[in-house]
A protein has these predicted regions:
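Short S/T/G/P-rich N-terminal loop/turn motif that feeds into the first structured element of a domain
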Residues: 1-57, 62-74, 98-115
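C-terminal structural segments of small proteins and small subunits
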Residues: 72, 77-97
């Protein structure tokens, strides 16, 4: 299992794709230049199965530590990325910082065999 921190950007469904598509490359250019970025993930929501919040997309930026994540957000590229995502969503996105733990199925099965 491994552990890191991620910045989660949740974009609501009422933000139109044409608006996102117009400046999304600019956002990615800035976000992907943030110091300490280890990896990135993007998920377009296909179907909402339950809940009140309708979501268009979840974009995640992964960092080794919380301090590195915070420093990246305050970096020049982080500030530019933040400004662009604010403009793209008219401030309607949700930003979360989360601890991310991940494991692969083979390791999980090892625990099941020991039960």
């Amino acid at each position: 299992m491994w552990f890191m921190y991620k910045l989660m950007i949740i974009i609501p469904a009422d933000i139109e794709d044409p608006m996102l598509n117009a400046r999304w490359p600019d956002f990615l250019r800035a976000a992907e230049s943030m110091p300490g970025l280890l990896r990135e993930a993007n998920a377009r929501v296909v179907t909402s199965l339950f809940g009140d919040q309708q979501i268009n997309m979840v974009h995640e930026l992964f960092f080794e530590t919380l301090i590195v994540l915070q420093e990246a957000m305050q970096s020049p590229d982080g500030l530019i990325a933040g400004q662009i995502i604010q403009e793209l969503t008219q401030g309607q996105m949700t930003l979360l910082v989360a601890e991310h733990r991940e494991d692969d199925i083979d390791n999980l099965r090892n625990y099941q065999q020991n039960d």
